[in-house]
Amino acid sequence: MASVIKIYALFLGSALLMFGGGLQGLLLSVRGAEEGFSLLALGLIGTGWSIGFVAGSLTVPLVVRKVGHIRAFSVMAAIGTITILLNLLWINDISWIVLRALSGFCFAGAAMIVESWLNEVSDNRSRGTTFSIYVSVTLFASTAGQMAISIT
């Protein structure tokens, strides 16, 4: 029962992060265009995410080894959330590129942490089912975040 609760919490945390990330990815492009950002700047904002994602994938395993899954996930989720909120305060293309890269770093880290954590708590018989549910939850949440733009 304890492992089911752990997995449920991981799914919920991942879903919330991916919802926010899905909304952020689409909303920044729309808002940047409304603010008059150049097409180059809008492209670099999207590229910043990818650069941050690669950097996070390479760096976060070291963080997990030092502080553990729970603390590392908490830090990635907190910083990822803060970067999204800072986009509201700093409305210029350079800061959005940097914030988007930091956001990509945190989202890659959070995904890596959740996936390694799920790998640890799943046995060989349930691992495929666990990961298929995880991927379904995160893709649904990301899509729902993108669709939420109609509400904003």
Report the location of each language-model feature:
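Helix-loop boundary and gating motifs at the non-cytosolic
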Residues: 3-50
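Intracellular juxtamembrane helix-capping segments at the cytosolic ends
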Residues: 28, 109-122
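Loop-to-transmembrane helix entry/capping segments in MFS-fold secondary transporters
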Residues: 39-40, 124-134
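Residue-level signature of mid-helix packing/kink "hotspots" within the transmembrane helices
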Residues: 50-54, 58, 142-143
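Helix-to-loop junctions at the C-terminal end of transmembrane segments
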Residues: 56-68, 149
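Helix-breaking motifs and short loop linkers at transmembrane-helix boundaries and internal kinks
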Residues: 68, 89-91
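Structural signature of the two symmetry-related core transmembrane helices
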Residues: 71-86
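Paired small-residue
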Residues: 94-102
